[in-house]
């Protein structure tokens, strides 16, 4: 499959993949976990996009179900949870059902309860929460805040508890989001209408312009 993909023969690769996925789906958890852990740790490594290497049906029939099963089978091992949240986020939301509040965060909090001192889990949850803060703030340069201020204040507190080291880069980035969050609250209580101008008047570093991807 990988060789055919590399040669650009996607259709032929998919023909090879289906029987492999079908046979692997029938294997015991131990065999499937050996394959999935190798796939996530070695093949995907630092890749951001997983779809080309983990397409359907391998994704839905083998990889994601195995990660959920392994998570239940060995609650003390955080790898399955971290890979689910980091690599298969859409499937985490789908499994939780429509309207479920923050399924990735809840999975990580459950994992943290089983392994409270695991640095990787703490950082993964902090990174997830930071992503929410950043996403909710990415239109501040247009004087718009997309998130729930009170909820994001609680998320900021949670990040601080997860990362007590104030020099941690994730903590530093979170404190910057916190500064913007508090500035936004003060701005909303003022009579001004332009957040960037308000920041300039109050010696607050203004938010970066984040709407560039809407251009063109």
Regions found by a protein language model. Give the residues of each.
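Hydrophobic/aromatic side-chain positions at a characteristic register within alpha-helices
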Residues: 5-6, 89, 96, 113
